[in-house]
Amino acid sequence: VTYYEESEKNVLRHIGYHRIEGFLQDSWKLAPRLTVDGGVRVAWIGPADDLEGRGIVVWDKARYDPQAPPSAVSGMTWHAIDPSVPTTGVRMPVFVTPRVGFAWDVAGTGVTVVRGGFGVYRYPDAPQFYGSMIDLAYGVRYFSTCCATSLRELEGLGTGEVIFGGQAVDKADDQQPRTLSWSLTLDRKLPWSTSLEIGYVGSKSDHQMNWWLDQYNAVPLGAMLDDPFGDANDYRPLPNYGNLYINRHSAYQNYHALQALLSRQRGRVNFTAAYTFSKNLGLKGADYNGYRANASEYAFDPREYNYGVLGTDRTHVASLSWSLQLPDVKRGGAWRALLGNWQLAGVSSYVSGAPLMGSFGIQGTTAGGAPISNEAITGSPDVYAMPVLVCDPRDSVPDGYLFNPACFTAPLPGANGSARQPYIKGQPYHNHDLSLAKNVPIGKGRRRLQIRVSAYNVFNHPIRFPDTTRNLTLVFDNGVQTNADFGKLPDDNKYGRRIVQLSARFEF
């Protein structure tokens, strides 16, 4: 038995929040060709609240006593034991969020228009993420013990220690998530009833919750190198706590994009072509598919370890939708009924591959025979073992692979790989849909029967995906990488097929 934990009760996690907002906005025509919009929103966005009344648990470092027993949960407080603490745990100020925009008709003819704007937006966290932060206030305690490898040792463990190893909010946190957004766009009318729109769009989101970076009681780097199989709690800075997750609004991200749109919505030929070139960077905390190098923004510099391309980044996104009304047949009778009123339409899309860095796994033994684990390589369960790169895996990629697997080598105890890994992308997505429709007039008026055949993924192009265990896991045997499928794009793990649909619709 290396670890055993038991919770003594279940709790009704009745979490919600309160929100009061008001706004003012107006529009001014400052000149015949210039219009400006402005406004301000004043909001009180309450933090997550325990609607049953005992309160969200708060971490107050000033109340922490290292000499107190673990069962005293020193440093923790909540409304039921200290009425000065609100049931929300923390208090929020009133937020003022301005926004402004403009439109400038350059020549006064409507042919060329420049638009831009800036705005600040506040919003609450989802309440369901706060459920475990009330457990302590309702008497939940955990029995936790470690570590027995034989029956004799198991008998000698005793009853264990009642500890708190959960979540709480930081007393000093008085923020709600914020996004600053701005844009500048040029609209231009072109010949053939076509319009072009090209612009820059940017945003910065800060005061984001530090999910997955909230380990407050992290084992220091290197502390367990000489004792990789020991109890991590013996090495934590706060000895009367285990894993301790203190949440605050300290994460951030930013987005920058060049966006273009070309469209024609008139006559027999209609189309819309859109393209976005973008980059999404930030702290890789709760970011899906983000490559986190450690679990603590408190113990380690988050900018050094966890800042980079987010899992939501897609460098290129392009789409084309179009429709073509085929020319009418001039001859009447059966020829017109057979060959007239046909419509052809299609949609094509392309999306760059998703970042793969966060999907990598590493296991096995080093060149010296040491097990590859966080404790053995970095000396801390809270700093993740990473491969050592000897070249850029985006160069000299073998056919059928997503990256060059020869660039990855095993780390050594005290010599971990870099926290900043190259931006490796997965397989791009592209798809084409096509439809052909025949409109048959019935009698007089607007009555008609439309018969349509549609083919989705018309070229029957499958999208292959790497399997995490087989294709994205490094397996080392005494420092030698033995997984021959690492980095390979498999032929048998693919999705997508052509779908043909027939439909009839009567309009009247």
Model feature map: region roles:
Residues 37, 111-115, 332-335:
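Surface-exposed patches in mature extracellular/periplasmic domains of secreted proteins
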Residues 1-107, 290-293:
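Signature of Gram-negative outer-membrane beta-barrel scaffolds
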Residues 16, 33, 45-47, 163-167, ...:
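Short, solvent-exposed micro-motifs at the edges of structured domains
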Residues 37-38, 125, 463:
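Generic hydrophobic alpha-helical membrane-span motif
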Residues 23, 36, 113-114, 343, ...:
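Hydrophobic alpha-helical segments
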Residues 53-247, 371, 406, 427:
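Solvent-exposed loop/turn elements at secondary-structure boundaries
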